[in-house]
Amino acid sequence: MTKKLSPLEKKNRKPASKACVFCHSKHLQCSNERPCKNCMKRNLGDQCHDAIRKRAKYLNTSGVKKMKSRTNSISSSYRSPSVSESPQNPYTHSIIKQEPDLNMRGELQSIQQENTSHNQPGPSNVSHYVDQRPTIPTNTMLDTTNDVLNKLLYSEPIHSDSISLRDSISEQPEMDSNRRSIDTMFNSNYLNQEYLMLGDIILHSKPSSPSPSNTSASEYNGDATISPANTLLNNTRLDFDNSNDHMSNSKRKLNKLKDSRPFIALGVSNDVPISLQPEGTLSLDNLSTKNEIMNKDNISSNSLKTDYVSPLISHHIYQSVQDIYMHSIPNFDYPQSYHSLTNFLKRRFSGNSLAHDQRQAKRNNLLIILKLIASYRPTFISAHKNLLKPYDLLFLEMSFQRSLIDYEKLLLFNSSPSIIWRRTGEIVSISNDLLSILGFNLSEILSKRTFIMELMYDDESIINYFKLFKSVAVGNLHSSIITKCKLMKNSSAAFHNEASDVADREYIEFCSAWTVKRDPFDIPMLIIGQFLPILPGGEGVRKY
């Protein structure tokens, strides 16, 4: 244990200008003489010498700049064919120009190897040096941020189909100077991410209709995309059938990819057909192999049936678990289902025949519902953006049909009236008890696209439905909900056995309990609702 010093000793002692190795490692107060007192006490006098300090970074800038200029002169005088094409390839150029700090260690090691070698560096040696540089993955987020900034601040997007090779080479230095001035604008990845989203909205996003559901029409379609920029990515499939057009096609497609960027997704999307290597060098063998794989996926996705199949037909096809694996499962088009839901809500809340105040109240209710849908739909889209299409989509639909068969068997042993619907609200199963209570038959509900909201009588029940579904759609894993709602009766059906006041009304009030079944991605797949009617009190009538 270190001896406790008196106040006089503390006052008289002077700190050493440099500590020895032992005192520096043990964080002890060292003295100026060598060997110091601490080393003498521990019989380490022969090992006592000054600790070597690291040189400050600001003192190394001049030496690093000289080494950088030397390496740049060597690489410019002797350049391999893959690097000489960098003005045409934006990804190679971004590595050489934008990331000197990341590649500095590799440059210093290369300079040391060059100084120790006896041979004079020739063109073959330097090309080997350039090719053997350590590959460090580039920050593609920063690269695309610079592209967005260049578009917003300096010039319009450059389309490679409308310019020649000479024009693209002449315009590259100007783009590089603009890019260098913007490199250090944002040091935060989150800030760059925000700016990328804003840039995509400004440059690319043009919704086809004011409906919020149209902004995300690609939840499950392999060919649909979230933004028009993804359409450009899907259109840039490389064709390697003719060997003479390999390099020209790759250059043209890469230039087209430079001015495009999809919205942010969870992981790397499998829709992108080519691999952009950090050095910008394209391996034709790898690209042709990947192109064949993607062509097979495109064929399978195009052959995937997306036509609407009513739940009534599905019940006749998939009557057992064996039928699910024996028959081909058509892909359920969730975006189209959301569009149909939006059209129904617009018709339901139009209020054309009502007074101005009532029509305005209807529109306000519609706005509330659309905001609730827009709050959870982007999460569904982003969670399914990285699915392997069409195989994951088939797996999810098979899981849905498999769960539906199990729950329908369970409802046969349950005496309460029940409805099963998808997360879009589309009804896929309804019990005979509830059909008899409401006065509908099975074909009226399941032979077409019918939403659970269509059976609700008042606007308050519909708004309450979307509020409750929003509470369990994202984040909250509580899988049961208890609420009240009013379901309308069939106006053409006759009710003779009910109480007089119930028969006169156009609706029946129910106490409802929901059970939410989630898919493997923790997104609601189907909802099982049990509805118990609330009947008026009286003799011989049970009230729930």
Curated annotation (Swiss-Prot):
Residues 20-48 bind DNA. It comes from the Eukaryota. Its main location: nucleus. It is found in: Nucleus. One of its GO terms (cellular component) is nucleus. The keyword Transcription applies. GO terms for molecular function: DNA-binding transcription factor activity, RNA polymerase II-specific; RNA polymerase II transcription regulatory region sequence-specific DNA binding; zinc ion binding. Residues 65-93 are annotated as: Disordered. GO terms for biological process: cellular response to starvation. Residues 403-475 form the PAS domain. Residues 70-86 have a biased composition (Low complexity). Keywords: DNA-binding, Metal-binding, Nucleus, Transcription, Transcription regulation, Zinc. Belongs to the ERT1/acuK family. Transcription factor which regulates nonfermentable carbon utilization. This is Glucose starvation modulator protein 1. It comes from Debaryomyces hansenii (strain ATCC 36239 / CBS 767 / BCRC 21394 / JCM 1990 / NBRC 0083 / IGC 2968). The gene is GSM1.
